[in-house]
């Protein structure tokens, strides 16, 4: 958590937990203070004229004189927590990630169950996704139907992706596995170029489709969607699938109405096999919401960040209060 004027604070993920041994010293100082106060009280009782003491001393000695010592001990505890190195989760923008947007352009995307049609809605939402994605991410675009084509190799140039989205054209059949394999090849190619570390850049495939794979008909075929999803998992590339449309979609083919219901189950299985997440959207607004969620997941990574600053500032504040109360109450620092 982060508090106003103090900064990040956490009570977990300590990097130097052995510093908590210093609390034994703090406890020893507190015990020493208590013993000194008891000894002081005994000395006063031993040498004082009891009749005179009772007449001039208050019946109940003020406990406020102990406040500076209490605050001093509290500040030492706070400084100890800070020295132990607490951490918290910090989200930072990714700069080396690769995202491949794989879009189904089969004839079923003509369906008008989502206005004006599935393709037009997909284009609008995908362009918004490209605009809002973290600038340092390399975004690529693949269109697939019976075959898959790399329209834009992974790049930080968002205009190239948006221009290509405007030029998507319908085609026959649906080869989902081909689209995934093509995306994996594009990721491997750009990963070799980007480099920049011992590991390849993190990558993600965002697969957008509305229907069942028709080529091949068996998704477990060597070129099928399920086989491609397993390959993606082996390569450490999760697939986020978006099934778009309603169960009531249809297209006109040779003056015949052909039902094209959305196929949620196949895409859900693809996401599961690859280690990714599955989403579904039945409207443009829902689709934009899904893309916004993906943007947050893909555009940032979570790392451990320092959370000791707040404890240091709070400790300094309490220490200052200890000094101030010592001057006001006892006219000197506690001994």
UniProtKB/Swiss-Prot annotation:
Q: Where are the transmembrane segments?
A: 18-38, 67-87, 309-329
Q: Does the keyword Cell membrane apply?
A: yes
What PROSITE patterns would the database entry show? VWFA
Q: What InterPro entries does the annotation carry?
A: UPF0353, UPF0353/GerABKA_families, VWF_A, vWFA_dom_sf
- CDD domains reported for this sequence: vWFA (cd00198)
What topology does it adopt in the membrane? Multi-pass membrane protein
- Kindly give the Gene3D superfamilies that the UniProt entry links to this protein: von Willebrand factor, type A domain
What are the entry keywords?
Answer: Cell membrane, Membrane, Transmembrane, Transmembrane helix
Q: Which residues form the VWFA domain?
A: 98-294
| Pfam families per record | VWA_2
Signal peptide interval: none
Asked if the Swiss-Prot or TrEMBL record annotates the protein with the keyword Iron, the reply is no
- Mind naming one GO cellular-component term on file for this protein? plasma membrane
**Where located?**
Cell membrane
Q: Which SUPFAM superfamilies match?
A: vWA-like
**Location (main, coarse):** membrane
Q: Which PANTHER family match?
A: LEUCINE ZIPPER PROTEIN 4, SPORE GERMINATION PROTEIN
Similarity-based family = Belongs to the UPF0353 family.
> Which HAMAP family would you find in this protein's record?
UPF0353
Quote the protein name from its UniProt record. Answer: UPF0353 protein MAP_1207
The protein's organism comes out as Mycolicibacterium paratuberculosis (strain ATCC BAA-968 / K-10) (Mycobacterium paratuberculosis)
The opening ranks of the lineage are:
Bacteria, Bacillati, Actinomycetota, Actinomycetes, Mycobacteriales
């Amino acid at each position: 958590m982060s508090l106003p004027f103090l900064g990040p604070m956490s009570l977990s993920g300590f990097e130097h937990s052995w510093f908590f041994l210093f609390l034994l010293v703090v406890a020893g100082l507190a015990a020493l203070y208590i013993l000194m106060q008891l000894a002081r009280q005994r000395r006063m009782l031993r040498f004082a004229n009891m009749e005179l003491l009772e007449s001039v001393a208050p019946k109940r000695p003020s406990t406020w004189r102990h406040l500076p010592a209490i605050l001093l001990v509290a500040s030492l505890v706070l400084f100890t927590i800070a020295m132990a190195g607490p951490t918290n989760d910090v989200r930072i923008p990714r700069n080396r990630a690769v995202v491949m947007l794989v879009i189904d352009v089969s004839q079923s995307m003509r369906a008008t169950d989502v206005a004006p049609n599935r393709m037009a809605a997909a284009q609008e939402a995908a362009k918004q996704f490209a605009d809002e994605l973290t600038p340092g991410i390399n975004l690529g675009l693949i269109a697939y139907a019976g075959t898959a084509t790399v329209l834009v190799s992974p790049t930080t140039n968002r205009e190239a992706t948006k221009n290509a989205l405007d030029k998507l054209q319908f085609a026959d059949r649906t080869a989902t596995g081909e689209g995934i394999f093509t995306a994996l090849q594009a990721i491997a190619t750009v990963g070799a170029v980007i480099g920049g570390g011992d590991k390849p850049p993190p990558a993600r495939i965002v697969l957008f489709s509305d229907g069942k794979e028709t080529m091949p008909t068996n998704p477990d075929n060597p070129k099928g969607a399920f086989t491609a999803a397993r390959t993606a998992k082996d390569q450490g590339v999760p697939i986020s699938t978006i099934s778009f449309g309603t169960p009531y979609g249809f297209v006109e083919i040779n003056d015949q109405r052909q039902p094209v219901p959305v196929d949620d189950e196949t895409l859900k299985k693809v996401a599961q096999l690859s280690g990714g997440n599955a989403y579904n959207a039945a409207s443009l607004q829902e689709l934009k919401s899904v893309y916004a969620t993906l943007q947050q997941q893909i555009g940032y990574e979570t790392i451990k960040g320092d959370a000791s600053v707040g404890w240091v500032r709070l400790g300094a504040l309490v220490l200052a209060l200890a000094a101030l109360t010592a001057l006001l109450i006892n006219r000197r620092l506690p001994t």
